[in-house]
């Protein structure tokens, strides 16, 4: 018997069990099964019919979904008889039926312990009961809890429709009466589709031959066990393990179940449970706490137990927390004494010396450098660093001279002869020992000089190693000879000799040690760097490039600490982790590896100490790229339960961000505010204030400053996009710094027509500006620093404000949509809007009314500035106009030659004319003075002016020609605003315009074109821009008008 099968009460061996009183249950009669009736929808009891003398009818296998014949036992097969023990004790043979029928046995029975029942997935199905509740012994915690009244009624009532529609409803009893499993359902015979005769229940009375075969079934099962290689004990163990695996696999049971999922009893749970075993949910709190919720049963009235654990206590023995606790951070200049930092660095250096890792010596050197910097308040001197490099240098290495190589001078491998070498015998070829003493060598050198043989004497001195005499003699000769002698002298030194490095550096080239250090054959890199730092002179850039090259070579060899030491000596700034081309991001850690391996705790602490040493000499010398690592270190402190220290780390980061002002990173600022918000209750001062004041929103002062700075950045960003600003403040700021407004990054919203509503406060109205009294003869003055304007570069007076449409009494169709190109160009200029005017083409075509957009201020020369007053720009900013929409007008060639010629010399004739302050009273006289006045329509009277700027066009197209930037109100006669010409405005009741109002407004199209002077009778006009169509209609802000520069040369 398998351990998971329900145990049956043993029956007395002397008598058979009493038959059940239930009429619907099948009875044992001569060890045959009676067919169990099924209830159909009409209430009749239908027995499945099967001919005893013939083969069973084909039935559908529930596992294969195919129609296979239910065949009787073959003649060659042997079935063991059912033993008496199985008959009397169990009531049914234990190994007679399929294992899958056991699953069908308990289909309609569920346990009140729904959690335990559902933990086995879809294993429990509805089935037909085969034993009474009192006839079995239930196990402790078993899901099989039988109910007597549920045995027949539940089966017949709940599954009436299912038995009707099931393809094997007539042979249902063959799948519901078995209690045992077939241990060989996964055997090769079962997998090949061959079913054993005993796998399916024999529903009709069996024949005599079948009785005999059934009696031999037990023997056949033992034979199968022997063939499969399983003993009885291992067979039972394998069955138990297989059954246990199937209990946790709901998909397997669902495949073989003839009962659909919707027919399962509604008492069971409908949704799958997330966990099959009891568990404990945990969560990490912001204050370094671990919150645990113990498992409970709310249905039984148990309340959940919430436990709070401190991460500082849990991780008290961890190495990472110990490393953070011993470091006295954050390192603030006013709170931490440098003696504590020096002690910490010395301990770290001693630990690095004890470890025998490859980079331990270089790591100890970095810690010793930090000690020296902390002692000297961040200052570095070359001789002090050289002493640090050579302090553990026990003895000088004996640098061996390398074998000679072919040089570019003599192209031979011959080396300079040594002192002990003698002359070679011509007969024998042997080298005779030299008998010359140093005195004799010097005497021969002197004799050669007696006779004026300088070259021979130089060669003799070089061969006999009289390098002092040779160098002095060569210095008085030609430079080529001196260079050759120096090369010969340095060639006698070893390549890895520090003297070779120094001499090469003094010769003005990067030493070979800078590109070869780090190899074992080359030797140590420290003496070379020491001799470079101690003898700095000449070209500082050459020395810096040499040290950086040495650092790059060491970094390529994997010596990161040594490379960073060189970078610090070359004053290389710290970079960012994401920029792989930067030299260093954290001191002693390579940023070319993974971030978690790069941003180690030791590297962050080492970099913070270096920043602290710099602040000892310069208080505000923060490392901008290091602030994000401080925030990361504060987060790690909070994770390890050190919340108070983490909150203290946020304060210097916030101080550094506030000191940088607008150059700070907004994302880092937001993350810092979030972390400080979570940790603010770790500050005891804040807790004390909350108790006394009762203010729950109280936070540290530096947090308040951070939030205010964040709001300022947001407001500035909103202002750049389209936030309304005061025009007067913008104009005054632009006048103070005209050279800076040109390089501002101007951006504004495009395509949002609703944003340009009634913003009358954005630009000053005409009442504020008043009628402008222009004096053309007043000399023009430029602000300081306006050299760019004199060179012809247009400098806008207004930097940020965008153009908008003011509310008008009428309506007007704007030619350019807000999302169009013309509107975008107008938005980039950011000049005040003015009223619309009409544009007159040169050929006299029909005037087209177009909305005016702000004018780009043009550049003026000194000659022009001597005549025109600066008040023109200061008092009448709305007067200037630019015609962006003329950009799409095709260019036209001049019709007459004389027009072009006269316009080219118009500026000279303008100088000869002497305009007066008096303007002509009407536009008729003004237009008569111009030779081209026939082509220009006269200005008509304007409507009544309104207090504010208006975009309402006049019904008469002729009245729009030459219109100024003002209109007439219906209730008053006073003219307000500024005239677009250079004349003065008329008084009340004036019906005409003064000055060159009749002149075509295309004069204002280009920023580099002069404004027309006041038209006086008898004066010569400047020129007509309509006659010069080759001029660019729109001048870019980034490029001056070259034609204007050639026509109006500047004077220095």
Swiss-Prot record:
Entry keyword annotation includes Nucleotide-binding: no
Topology versus the membrane: Peripheral membrane protein
Biased composition (Polar residues): 163-181, 739-753, 766-781, 1024-1039
InterPro entries: Sec16_CCD, Sec16_Sec23-bd
Any one annotated GO CC term: Golgi membrane
Keyword Membrane applies: yes
Segments of skewed composition (Gly residues): 984-995
One of the GO BP terms on file: protein transport
Protein's cellular compartments: Endoplasmic reticulum membrane; Golgi apparatus membrane
Region (Central conserved domain (CCD)): 271-718
Pfam family, any one: TPR_Sec16
Modified residues (Phosphoserine): 55, 75, 142, 166, 187, 190, 253, 257, 863, 866, 869
Biased composition (Low complexity): 902-911, 941-961
Assembly with partners or alone: SEC16A and SEC16B are each present in multiple copies in a heteromeric complex. Interacts with TFG. Interacts with SEC13.
Family stated for the protein in its record: Belongs to the SEC16 family.
Free-text function comment from the UniProt entry: Plays a role in the organization of the endoplasmic reticulum exit sites (ERES), also known as transitional endoplasmic reticulum (tER). Required for secretory cargo traffic from the endoplasmic reticulum to the Golgi apparatus. Involved in peroxisome biogenesis. Regulates the transport of peroxisomal biogenesis factors PEX3 and PEX16 from the ER to peroxisomes.
Name this protein carries in UniProt: Protein transport protein Sec16B
Species annotation: Bos taurus
